[in-house]
Amino acid sequence: MTDNELSALVVDNGSGMCKAGFGGDDAPRAVFPSMIGRPRHQGVMVGMGQKDCYVGDEAQSKRGVLTLKYPIEHGVVTNWDDMEKIWYHTFYNELRVAPDEHPILLTEAPLNPKINREKMTQIMFEAFNTPAMYVAIQAVLSLYASGRTTGIVMDSGDGVTHIVPIYEGYALPHAILRLDLAGRDLTDYLMKILTERGYNFTTTAEREIVRDVKEKLCYVALDFEQEMVRAAASSSPERSYELPDGQVITIGNERFRCPEAIFQPSFLGIESSGIHETTFNSIMKCDVDIRKDLYANTVLSGGSTMYPGIADRMQKEIITLAPSTMKIKIIAPPERKYSVWIGGSILASLSTFQQMWISKQEYDEAGPPIVHRKCF
């Protein structure tokens, strides 16, 4: 019997990327964009096997003739039919397993609408016939992956940023904070500030190009004002980027102006505090006795924490806010892009976790709301 035969499937459905694989593995087998592409034009060549919709990497590669849609926005599923297609693609094309033979661990952002996880549960049991499933909170899994039981996790992906303090394995729900400001908003902002340079990006396919520019060239400035002055005085921050058609664009202070928006959301016209202040606010909502441990274990996770310079900037900002004697440590593991998935893989393979699964039998007896009773 191979190890994959009975192992759990771990699926981290992000707003931007879907990470999937087997519990117990140290990395996801499949990582692909959580997108559905539909042709914008009429197919004229018969026998080419054109589909009415493409999923993931295939949609990405044919994006020039497709309209791309992401079924998950700000961590909440907005189109369940498309979501089901993504799950189908995950199980049958990427992992090549039968979902009715494996327990399935899914992930979710905290403070999501309750109906979201009920519907997830319903689809898993009714459409995919899974024998058992569980829904875990993303930030909690990141803490598992970092090997800690106490810490505050700042998880920022493509759709949602959330901050979850955990003490000795207990999440502190009153102090969980959520910002609907993440990678996708930064991509849109970069699209906007690139138009100031005379580069026009408008279609859903061009947005993907801008996302690539963002991932390859953006960084977080340690001191934003100083960096702006430096950029105005010299051309050192300038970098060039070759578009798919060979045209070369130049990008300068946009490289750090774009991610600055997660520290200063007012750039996007969003009235909220930046990630540093939100993290501080979350710590201040916790009991005075445990704050010290949270300051010393601030864990970053998610794709939007991959900008060079973000950990140093975070450290600097929190030192400014916190009491002067406090020891502050920002933990930014190199694999933090996948730490939610890795935490899920660890959780699914723990022997003590096996009684936590929601079984098909329990679902049949209680229906979708069972998920609120059994999952944190």
From Swiss-Prot:
GO process annotations (BP): axonogenesis; cell motility
Keyword presence, Electron transport: no
A Gene Ontology cellular-component term: NuA4 histone acetyltransferase complex
Keyword Nucleotide-binding found: yes
Key words of the record: ATP-binding, Cytoplasm, Cytoskeleton, Nucleotide-binding, Oxidation
InterPro entries in UniProt: Actin (IPR004000), Actin/actin-like_CS (IPR020902), Actin_CS (IPR004001), ATPase_NBD (IPR043129)
Methionine (R)-sulfoxide PTM sites in chain numbering: M45, M48
PTMs per UniProt: Oxidation of Met-45 and Met-48 by MICALs (MICAL1, MICAL2 or MICAL3) to form methionine sulfoxide promotes actin filament depolymerization. MICAL1 and MICAL2 produce the (R)-S-oxide form. The (R)-S-oxide form is reverted by MSRB1 and MSRB2, which promote actin repolymerization.
Origin: domain of life: Eukaryota
Coiled coil regions, renumbered to chain: none
Pfam families the UniProt entry points to: Actin
Location of the protein in the cell: Cytoplasm, Cytoskeleton
Gene Ontology MF term list: ATP binding; protein kinase binding; structural constituent of postsynaptic actin cytoskeleton
SUPFAM superfamilies: Actin-like ATPase domain (SSF53067)
Family designation: Belongs to the actin family.
PANTHER family: ACTIN
Binding partners and assembly: Polymerization of globular actin (G-actin) leads to a structural filament (F-actin) in the form of a two-stranded helix. Each actin can bind to 4 others. Interacts with PFN1 and PFDN1.
Role, per record: Actins are highly conserved proteins that are involved in various types of cell motility and are ubiquitously expressed in all eukaryotic cells.
Extra remark beyond the main annotation: In vertebrates 3 main groups of actin isoforms, alpha, beta and gamma have been identified. The alpha actins are found in muscle tissues and are a major constituent of the contractile apparatus. The beta and gamma actins coexist in most cell types as components of the cytoskeleton and as mediators of internal cell motility.
Protein name in the entry: Beta-actin-like protein 2
Source organism of the structure: Homo sapiens (Human)
Gene: ACTBL2
